[in-house]
């Protein structure tokens, strides 16, 4: 069904968050069923790995979504990197019910993994408010960079 563009049958694939290591590519992504449309059931990050972008190994949901009462009812985009201690994911948690209750609907979150496949979420939301000029309802999709010179 797919070549180069990974798409499981019957699923909308969105927000690809790639990570590569030693010729292996981790293709983290969102799977939206669009059921009911246009914004379907809550989702986490799914994972497929590949070495050639033709053949894939599908792991299904790798970073699990939260409950309907948690900040990460949906797990929106983010980024993955690796340190000596393992993998880190910084991502956006979104809850579509929070705005109605007067809560912040999007928050930055963190998870760790030993293998890049199974993730453990940190318990605390990150206290990183949007800078002046950014929409507080659309503060999301963190991307982490390593500064070689400063080693941070």
Annotate the PLM regions.
Residues 1-152:
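Beta-rich carbohydrate-recognition and catalytic domains
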